[in-house]
Amino acid sequence: FKVIDTKKIVWLNLTGSGNETAAHLLKNKRMTIMFCSFDETPLILRLYGNANIYHESDQEYIKLKKLFKNFTGARQIIEMDINQVQTSCGYAVPFMEYKQERTQLNESDLKKGRDGIKQYWKDHNTKSLDGFETI
């Protein structure tokens, strides 16, 4: 996840069990991102805007990919133009302690290799749960 400026964010979408975000962005570019504080200071931050999704063959993907570490399972880059920011108290958000990142996804992707990842997309990620096409 990268902040480009006060009105633009981008993130690398990794291969997973579904491709829901991409499918829904093809139908409607509106997106909401929510951040929660799980430590001492309660807070919820929401970013509202419109997003574009770029696949590895897109020029924007090639340009933005330089911002991220290389992941075998990289599927798309999502770029969101922020048009509204909202905060709320976060009083109902529980305390949670961060332990560490999980490594299984990247390890699994490395075993599949890039060709195996692309086959996984064909086998598992061509439609959303609603039946919408994905990229």
Predicted features and spans:
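Binding-site signature for planar aromatic cofactors or substrates
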Residues: F1-I135
